[in-house]
């Protein structure tokens, strides 16, 4: 048994491995899936990305918090992660944009974290055994009946939590009501964006291209899409298992039947894949970072991309397949593991649709794939 006291914080994995550190952010108990992020920067964007909802994020970069927390870089209205794990938190925020420390931001939003653990050993453990359920415990959460809880009790609490496979999470992060992000300058196109966990930078990137974006709740019916008469339909990123997204999948099929130009990213790629009859599966430890290569097979070009996904669409590079909406093609894959990173419908009689598994809007990350928004613009103009 690891010896610990009330001044400790523990990260407990479902396989019984326990890491001891100190509290960081709020104290208490947090349960979720432990995943690791290899990005060296952009922790504020990571923490506020709705795709991380229900997950305990482990930072591989050894020092976190150097630039504090500002009022401009949030990708949603709040911190989305279930818990946070770092090696060496910065003792001081050093940025003219900072309004508070990372520690203060976590504490004010009730996010339970742990610092001072060997994140390198933890990441190797998750890489070899796969991501798994975990819990962060500190303060009163370390107690059971007034005494320090034994390790076995903490492990049992973790094992009682829900698994990510089969998790229906997008409903917890979608907007409760429709809203509009206006175009910058004169609006030239209108997009209906289905919010299953959309990041703030996505409608911002569209606005820069003269697109007015109507962000819609995940349960929006096709009748509302028809009322808007959009030039295009966008499927956002989001959390959870795509196998649970039956509503968005059915809506996507209705959009394809109406031949509305469609573009999807991340979770949206998985939704489109399911709408086209493809299966999805859970990756061993996922792709989470801002320097992940992707090959576009039509051009044999490589883009360095920002990614955050634990599930993927079934398929192989260059694979062609039949769908009710026209011939389909696996357009992009990751050279690291062959994972599908993009889909498209092809041919003059096919519905105009394509998607990618990565994040062309970055935030944080490289902008190699920003031209995909321009492709979407061209697809919409062709459909006018």
What are these regions (language model features)?
Residues 212-218:
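Short hydrophobic/Thr-rich beta-strand motif most characteristic of the beta2 strand and flanking loop
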Residues 13, 36, 58-59, 86, ...:
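General beta-strand structural signal in soluble alpha/beta enzymes
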Residues 116, 232-236, 256-277, 359:
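Catalytic nucleophile loop
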Residues 237-241:
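Short glycine-rich anion-binding loops that position phosphate/pyrophosphate groups of nucleotides
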Residues 56, 60, 121-122:
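Conserved phosphate/anionic-ligand binding catalytic regions in large, soluble enzymes, centered on
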Residues 3, 7-45, 50-52:
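Intrinsically disordered, low-complexity, positively charged segments
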Residues 4-5, 41-44, 50, 64, ...:
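Amide-donor transfer/coupling interface in amidating biosynthetic enzymes
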């Amino acid at each position: 048994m690891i010896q610990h006291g009330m001044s400790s914080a523990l990260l407990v994995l479902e396989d019984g491995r326990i890491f001891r550190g100190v509290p960081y952010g709020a104290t208490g108990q947090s349960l979720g899936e432990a995943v690791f992020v290899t990005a060296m920067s952009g922790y504020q964007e990571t923490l506020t990305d709705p795709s991380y909802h229900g997950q305990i994020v482990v930072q591989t970069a050894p020092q976190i918090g150097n630039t504090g927390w500002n009022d401009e870089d949030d990708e949603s209205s709040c911190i989305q992660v279930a818990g946070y794990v770092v090696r060496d938190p910065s003792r001081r925020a050093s940025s003219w944009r900072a309004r508070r420390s990372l520690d203060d931001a976590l504490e004010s939003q009730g996010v339970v974290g742990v610092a001072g653990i060997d994140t390198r050993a933890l990441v190797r453990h998750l890489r070899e055994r796969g991501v798994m359920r975990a819990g962060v415990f500190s303060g009163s959460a370390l107690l059971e009946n007034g005494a320090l809880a034994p390790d076995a009790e903490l492990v049992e609490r973790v094992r009682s939590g829900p698994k990510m496979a089969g998790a229906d999470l997008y409903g917890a992060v979608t907007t409760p009501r429709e809203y509009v992000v206006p175009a910058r300058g004169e609006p030239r196109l209108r997009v209906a964006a289905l919010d299953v966990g959309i990041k703030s930078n996505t409608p911002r990137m569209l606005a820069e291209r003269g697109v007015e974006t109507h962000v819609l709740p995940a349960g929006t019916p096709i009748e509302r899409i028809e009322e808007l008469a959009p030039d295009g339909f966008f499927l956002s990123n989001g959390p959870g298992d795509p196998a649970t997204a039956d509503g968005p999948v059915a809506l996507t099929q209705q959009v394809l039947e109406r031949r509305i130009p469609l573009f999807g990213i991340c979770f949206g790629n998985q939704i489109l894949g399911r709408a086209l009859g493809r299966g999805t599966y859970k990756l061993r430890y996922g792709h989470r970072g801002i320097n992940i290569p992707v090959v576009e097979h039509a051009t044999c070009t490589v883009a360095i991309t920002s990614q955050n996904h634990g599930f993927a669409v079934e398929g192989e590079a260059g694979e062609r397949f039949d769908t009710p909406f026209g011939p389909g093609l696996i357009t992009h894959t990751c050279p690291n593991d062959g994972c599908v990173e993009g889909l498209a419908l092809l041919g003059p009689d096919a519905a105009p649709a394509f998607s990618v598994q990565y994040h062309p809007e970055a935030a944080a990350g490289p902008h190699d794939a920003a031209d995909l928004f321009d492709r979407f613009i061209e697809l919409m103009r062709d459909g006018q």
